[in-house]
């Protein structure tokens, strides 16, 4: 009985501390009462806009699991961002597991839940809607890919911990703007590319980064930096790989945890980096228009339009002002060369009416840009 009393006192103390910091909120969505934990930083003011950060738990987990391994409240106070830990809804096709992406035939889609939640929060608080960020662990990270692919008009940047892209995402992803993304992946993570009965379920880390670097039109080769091995007892080291100079000056970053597993570095596994700190440092540099600080693009939008028009298009693209005979390539987001041709000086036209709708990379000599086929 004495031990029970001690446990109860401890439980209520922890619960009280938690409740004093977080606001447990509910919202009715798609006929279900959905929960989320909301943290308003001490530095919040109604007189200025604050960024918004979503932090998504892993599959079968709950908000408090993610808060335990990724408690960003101090960061939120220091940097004046509003923090949200949403709760996934039980998946009836997976024994009631709390999954962000439900299995089997389902019309459940949490992309719309987050879309509604952004609108709900922005109606209550002074939120900078150009600086809405997302990070997540495991299945929560897979959901971050979904947000970047399908809700990119509202998500400025994202970070994925312990998950590569699903094959279905790789095949269908279509962001609407240059998209900064960072991953923190262990080389021994079982999600480093998965096949089942000859079918690819998750692509590899290299394929994941290739997709985003090609989409963002970054430098082909990354800068590699070995992070100091400050904890020699954690069984792992970290290599930072940085692809720079993407469109709108966005970048792609990988923290490759050599010897690391399915973990959140700084909480478990590798202790050479603190994932929370690295996440905020990365995403906070961007808004939906790209790098927030001065970005010296090689071509302005006006200059791009003077060369390639119309863009987007359903059929004909006109290429103007070519001073030299050039090699032209059209490349899809998987890196496949769809067209290779030589074009003459002056004005040329391309007919892309037979192409599938989506985003392509047009390269002419040393110049490259995205074209959108409607």
Residue positions per predicted region:
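C-terminal outer-membrane/trafficking sorting elements
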Residues: 300-374
């Amino acid at each position: 009985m004495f031990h029970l009393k001690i446990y109860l006192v401890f439980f209520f103390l922890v619960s009280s501390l938690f409740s004093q910091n977080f606001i447990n909120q509910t919202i009715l969505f798609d006929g279900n009462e959905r929960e989320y934990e909301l943290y308003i930083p001490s530095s919040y003011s109604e007189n200025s806009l604050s960024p918004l950060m979503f932090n998504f738990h892993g599959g079968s987990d709950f908000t408090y699991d993610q808060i335990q391994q990724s408690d960003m409240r101090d960061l939120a106070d220091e940097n004046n961002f509003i923090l949200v830990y949403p709760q996934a809804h039980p998946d009836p096709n997976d024994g009631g597991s709390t999954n962000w992406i439900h299995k089997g035939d389902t019309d459940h889609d949490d992309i719309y839940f987050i879309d509604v939640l952004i609108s709900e929060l922005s109606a209550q608080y002074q939120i900078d809607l150009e600086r809405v960020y997302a990070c997540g662990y495991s299945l929560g990270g897979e959901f971050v890919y979904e947000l970047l692919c399908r809700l990119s008009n509202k998500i400025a940047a994202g970070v994925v911990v312990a998950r590569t892209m699903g094959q279905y995402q790789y095949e269908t992803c279509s962001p609407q703007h240059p998209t900064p993304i960072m991953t923190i992946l262990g080389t021994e993570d079982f999600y480093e590319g998965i096949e089942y009965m000859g079918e690819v379920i998750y692509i590899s880390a290299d394929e994941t980064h290739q997709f985003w670097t090609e989409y963002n039109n970054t430098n082909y080769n990354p800068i590699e930096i070995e992070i100091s091995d400050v904890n020699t007892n954690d069984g792992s080291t970290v290599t930072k790989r940085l692809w720079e100079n993407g469109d709108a000056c966005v970048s792609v970053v990988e923290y490759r945890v050599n010897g690391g597993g399915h973990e959140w570095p700084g909480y478990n596994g590798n202790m050479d980096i603190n994932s929370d700190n690295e996440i905020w440092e990365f995403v906070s540099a961007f808004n939906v228009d790209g790098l927030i600080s001065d970005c010296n693009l090689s071509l302005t939008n006006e200059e791009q339009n003077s060369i390639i028009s119309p863009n987007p298009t359903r059929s004909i693209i006109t290429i103007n002002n070519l001073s030299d005979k050039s090699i032209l390539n059209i490349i899809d987001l998987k890196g496949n060369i769809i067209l290779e041709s030589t074009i003459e000086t002056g004005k040329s036209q391309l007919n892309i009416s037979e192409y599938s709708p989506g985003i392509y990379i047009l390269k002419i000599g040393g110049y490259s840009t995205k074209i959108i086929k409607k």
